[in-house]
A protein has these predicted regions:
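Short beta-strand
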Residues: 123-127, 161-164
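A generic structural motif
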Residues: 130-136, 168-172
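Active-site phosphate-binding/coordination module
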Residues: 39-126
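Asp-based phosphoryl-transfer active-site loop
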Residues: 11-33, 61, 182
Length: 248
């Protein structure tokens, strides 16, 4: 594990022989106080379409967002995608399997979280269907309260776990993560047998870095978070765009 990402080299130039996996928030788009307010530029969408074609479809989005939300953000593209940290997964051009509806307890937790966040203007509860995320980017002072709530709430949800992130904590089903999603894609065409590369910024992306590195591929960290198992680094979203060929 690398302790000093500032000294990691940049990734090599893109190759159409790769299997390319891309995180979204903090990688392809900057973080926003409200996740619903992010915007993907037409230039990035156009470049991803070109790359997916050049790679024979071996390009996938790996995100904590729902796949349905990714489709709206990157419209008209419908790329291979994993959502909710691997709970959802869809091959390019195929329908998304519909997961079972949330439990009554999860719905109750969501309502309690909304009531709690209402007392902290700027705190945000993001309903992800089978998961729920508590954000405090616009209200950092709410972090201890939201984290404490999440720590208790997860004990009421059998099979769920806490997933900390960048100014967010998420309650989501366990047994899956971004690494398991990437691993599943790598077992299928058109990803199978290719050099795997995963680009991401957050703590949740370490699962994906670990999988591609164990398979002889490359993890690319965006930013300067430490420690990391990634072996290459890009400093920010603008650098990711430039590396992809979608820069200004």
């Amino acid at each position: 594990m690398t302790d000093g990402p500032t000294f990691l080299p940049p990734p090599p130039p893109l190759s159409d022989r790769w299997a390319l996996f891309l995180d979204v928030d903090g990688t392809l788009v900057p973080f926003a106080d409200d996740p619903a307010q992010v915007y993907v530029s037409p230039r990035v969408i156009s470049r991803l379409a070109s790359l997916a074609t050049a790679m024979d479809g071996a390009l996938a989005l790996i995100s904590g967002r729902q796949v349905e939300v990714l489709d709206r953000l990157f419209a008209p593209l419908r790329l291979a995608s994993a959502g909710l940290h691997g709970l959802q997964r869809r091959r390019a051009g195929e329908p998304l399997a519909v997961p079972p509806p949330p439990t009554g307890t999860l719905q109750q937790v969501k309502q309690e979280a909304l009531a709690l966040a209402a007392g902290w203007p700027g705190a945000l509860v993001e309903d992800k269907g089978e998961a729920v995320a508590l954000h405090w980017r616009a209200m950092p002072e709410a972090a201890p309260v939201l984290q404490a709530f999440a720590a208790v709430a997860v004990t009421r949800l059998p099979g769920y776990q806490l997933q900390p992130g960048d100014m967010v904590v998420e309650l989501r089903p366990g047994q899956v993560d971004k690494g398991t999603a990437i691993e599943a894609f790598l077992g299928e065409a058109p990803f199978h047998g290719r050099f795997p590369v995963f680009v991401g910024d957050d703590l949740t992306d370490e699962h994906g870095f670990r999988v591609v590195e164990e398979r002889g591929g490359l993890g690319v960290l965006v930013g300067d978070r430490t420690p990391t198992v990634a072996r290459a680094r890009l400093p920010d979203v603008a650098a990711v765009h430039a590396w992809l060929g979608a820069g200004d």
